[in-house]
UniProtKB/Swiss-Prot annotation:
One Pfam family, short name: DHquinase_II
Listed EC numbers: 4.2.1.10
Complex formation: Homododecamer.
Catalytic activity: 3-dehydroquinate = 3-dehydroshikimate + H2O
Protein name (Swiss-Prot/TrEMBL): 3-dehydroquinate dehydratase
Length: 144
């Protein structure tokens, strides 16, 4: 089983930006953690990141018929990218939206996700482990 993890803007600056919100772990730490945990449960995980909306859409479209599921952290695009919403809907691949912080306890403008309705579920507030939760949920759903 293959799962694609897509990270949006500024996720590459983990460990540098807003450590009080996102923690001390770096983006490299996150990628290693996700791949290692996926491997433990028999999942091949590919991780990608872009700060550019169009590239994220390209990642999604390139995944069509190539992966079994997607975990996506759209970053700030969560709150306004109809284009990413449309891309998720168009590829018909089970997708879980993940956020390191709990977006529902953050600033008002961060509490609404326009991309989550295109996904089968949303996980937020569990730090890096939220990605593992998303991968595990996809594995369980796809194995039925």
């Amino acid at each position: 089983m293959k799962i694609l993890v897509i990270n949006g803007p500024n996720i590459n600056f983990l460990g540098i930006r807003e450590k009080e919100i996102y923690g001390e772990g770096t983006y490299e730490d996150l990628c290693k953690f996700i791949k290692d945990e996926g491997s433990k449960i028999g999942i091949e995980v590919e991780v990608m990141q872009s700060n550019i909306e169009g590239e994220i859409i390209n990642f999604l479209q390139a995944a069509y018929n190539k992966v079994d599921g997607i975990v996506i952290n759209p970053g700030a695009y969560t709150h306004y990218s109809i284009a990413i919403y449309d891309a998720i809907k168009s590829i018909n691949i089970p997708t879980v939206e993940v956020h390191i912080s709990n977006i529902h306890t953050r600033e008002e403008y961060r509490r609404k996700s326009v991309t989550a309705p295109a996904c089968i579920g949303q996980i937020c507030g569990f730090g890096f482990y939220g990605y593992v939760m998303g991968i595990t949920a996809l594995k369980n759903m796809l194995s039925k």
